[in-house]
Amino acid sequence: MSKLTKRQKEINSRIEHEKQYTIEEAVQILNDLPPLKFKESIDIAVNLGVDPRKSDQVVRGATNLPAGTGKTKRVAVFAQGAAAEAAKEAGADIVGFEDLAESIKAGNMDFDVVIAAPDAMRVVGQLGTILGPRGLMPNPKVGTVTPNVAEAVLNAKAGQAQYRVDKAGIIHTTIGQVGFTAEQVIQNAEALISDLRRAKPATSKGTFIKKITLSSTMGPGLSIDPVPYRTAK
């Protein structure tokens, strides 16, 4: 068995593994941990009362986070004509059409989000085996296939959390950075969970928001009391 590092020992001394924390308490703990050489994300995992094996219970979407994510994302847009110009004005980092597709095929992947106008999907569709495994394939369910590419660019730049339930019925996404205030994380978490409640499949029965966990990139997973988040505020 590998030895615990000094940081791991300190983490273990600060947390109660059986406790359910408030988000405010959890953020305080994560912010007070010994800092690393990089800025850690604050991530959330929400266990949902769904069976993702059933196609009508696959929960997928995107939430515009009120406090952002703390990171600036590079955005690539597939568009032409007026839509391409609008994307550039909105702050897109890369805008193109067939030329962008060829660049991606050549291995140029210097972006975090891909947005496409509907008429560009005939081009983007050729990139499924490249973009799909990386979670970058545009999809109308998360607002990345849209006639209003400028708005999508603004949302991505402002801080948007995309999510899709995994095989275990859990969504994982980033809702901030270490250093965010508790209020910022609470605002983002409430916005996300509110969207999740609205996305509850009609065939999902029983408790929908089953469990919530907050963590930092290299920090502990802290169990959050889910009860206050099961109903609209």
Curated annotation (Swiss-Prot):
InterPro entries: Ribosom_uL1_bac-type, Ribosomal_uL1, Ribosomal_uL1-like, Ribosomal_uL1/biogenesis, Ribosomal_uL1_3-a/b-sand, Ribosomal_uL1_CS
Gene3D superfamilies tied to this protein: 3.30.190.20, 3.40.50.790
GO cellular component: cytosolic large ribosomal subunit
One Pfam family linked to the record: Ribosomal_L1
GO molecular function: rRNA binding; structural constituent of ribosome; tRNA binding
Domain of life: Bacteria
Biological processes per GO annotation: regulation of translation; translation
Protein name as catalogued: Large ribosomal subunit protein uL1
Species this chain originates from: Psychrobacter arcticus (strain DSM 17307 / VKM B-2377 / 273-4)
